UniProtKB/Swiss-Prot annotation:
Active site: E323 (proton donor)
Entry annotated with the keyword Aminoacyl-tRNA synthetase: no
Record-level Gene Ontology MF annotations: acetylglucosaminyltransferase activity; beta-N-acetylhexosaminidase activity; protein heterodimerization activity
Organism in which the protein naturally occurs: Rattus norvegicus (Rat)
Pfam family, any one: Glyco_hydro_20
The protein's name in its UniProt record: Beta-hexosaminidase subunit alpha
Alphabetical list of Gene3D superfamilies matching this protein: Chitobiase/beta-hexosaminidase domain 2-like, Glycosidases
Disulfide bridge map: C58-C104, C277-C328, C504-C521
GO cellular component: azurophil granule; beta-N-acetylhexosaminidase complex; lysosome; membrane
Keyword field contains Acyltransferase: no
UniProt EC number: 3.2.1.52
InterPro entries recorded: Beta_hexosaminidase_sua/sub (IPR025705), Glyco_hydro_20_cat (IPR015883), Glycoside_hydrolase_SF (IPR017853), Hex-like_dom2 (IPR029018), HEX_eukaryotic_N (IPR029019)
Keywords: Disulfide bond, Glycoprotein, Glycosidase, Hydrolase, Lipid metabolism, Lysosome, Signal, Zymogen
Region (Critical for hydrolysis GM2 gangliosides): 422-423
Amino acid sequence: MAGCRLWVSLLLAAALACLATALWPWPQYIQTSHRRYTLYPNNFQFRYHAGSAAQAGCVVLDEAFRRYRSLLFGSGSWPRPSFSKKQQPLGKNILMVSVVTAECNEFPNLESVENYTLTINDDQCLLSSETVWGALRGLETFSQLVWKSAEGTFFINKTKITDFPRFPHRGILLDTSRHYLPLSSILNTLDVMAYNKFNVFHWHLVDDSSFPYESFTFPELTRKGSFNPVTHIYTAQDVKEVIEYARLRGIRVLAEFDTPGHTLSWGAGVPGLLTPCYSGSRLSGTYGPVNPSLNSTYDFMSTFFLEISSVFPDFYLHLGGDEVDFTCWKSNPNIQAFMKKKGFTDYKQLESFYIQTLLDIVSDYDKGYVVWQEVFDNKVKVRPDTIIQVWREEMPVQYMKEIEAITQAGFRALLSAPWYLNRVKYGPDWKEMYKVEPLAFRGTPAQKALVIGGEACMWGEYVDSTNLVPRLWPRAGAIAERLWSSNLTTNMDFAFKRLSHFRCELLRRGIQAQPISVGYCEQEFEHT
């Protein structure tokens, strides 16, 4: 195995040496050479292949063609470059794009195929894929292959790439409750996610701190639960824009509404929803988690999640279920009476009762669900297709042991525990995130097939729009490559060179990505 890895490392290093630009994330299979072709910005075109199922009018690809032309060449005109005989023009200055299945008006899903093949040689410049989602990934790779000489001439090397993701779920979580993130910050994040081939935006919309989601069924939730009901909310149009913006980049929107804990912001808008806490025999004036003993709680949840199910088109909703503090439930005599009536002797049983009822409600709306690991740990009865997200890194249960237990029980798993980007420390902390191997647990091949990917999490206690971008990028890129590329792509020196280059490319694209070491970029951020 060591010899195999050394050979792979040498091969990758050789590939990097003959590429004028480095790719991020690294593709599964690549052949490239020093032979290069000139591109002319003034007449370069993206064009549909005659045999493609998608043609002009396919909004996903039409919009992508416009975006990538701008990313490559900008909006100005360029003088025609002079070139020697060794610099061969690239065909007719056209990238032909061919897809087998046109899904132009659909949404990406967990089963979407993102494979693509990119061929650049003397005879053709062709991007082939089974779906438009694969074509989007190939367009990003193509954009990273194009490079500009010191004289201002655009080139691309002779290249053959066959590429596909290692995991189908590659996400970023943004917390928009603890600090409100303007719509522009979310859209900007979606752009850079596409550059990194992420495909899931996990939107942690609400929490204890605020309820910025504008509910049309329960408008008081937003009016009384947001930081500011005018300036710090996401309107129905905002949510719709995020979903469509993400779709055009091949990104799913996984909405999270976490209950029964993390719900203090819900209380003012829905009287009676939260549990009143007691101090001795008297009400303390404070509130705890959702009250699981009242029928009105489940009536509300049924109506509310009917709305959510209609607003968010993805098959999956994230229902949370983490960090439920039992202190308030323990203090409340009505909760104690309810538990006695039900025969519950443990507050985890009460929590399980609530969550099981909620899961049944959501299932009735033909939705699947993702939950945090506590739902599994507390032995809540869930459907076999439930996805469990692992976030707890601390002992006594190390996260790989947790994944082993989850997959042994037959459930699919997502890994987030080692990828909390809101946590920062001095130095190149991206390296530790890059070194994580999601399948490094004892398990059968069938178990390991149940790990469907992971997410980088950006919790918002100390993050808002002022520091979101440099804290996310390019650090999140380490997770992007770990979830996309082969498990053999692990050489740290090779990764460092490519990530440094990619960080400079992000600056060129107007993204204020932080440095990963000492150095410089030809085009610094203030020059964009």
